[in-house]
């Protein structure tokens, strides 16, 4: 099982043949990993506070699946390797068919 925690109390989980997005510990999206079709990445650099409270680097990934679910996820840039590992697992599940 692979998982990565993101912003807004969200988590992505790849567990065998299933991919799931959780928010606050509750499942919001659960789809077969083999239905994965692609991902779009965006790097974000933004201010933390309203009045110059420092900057933070984030990565946003949008995942597309057969049948319509589109999953957006935002995490610290330091977690990019964890996200890439989940995407590699989704790619291998897709090509295993």
What function would you assign to each model-found segment?
Residues 5-25:
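Short, compositionally biased strand/turn segments
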Residues 1-3, 7-8, 27-97:
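Acidic, Ser/Thr- and proline-rich intrinsically disordered linker/docking segments
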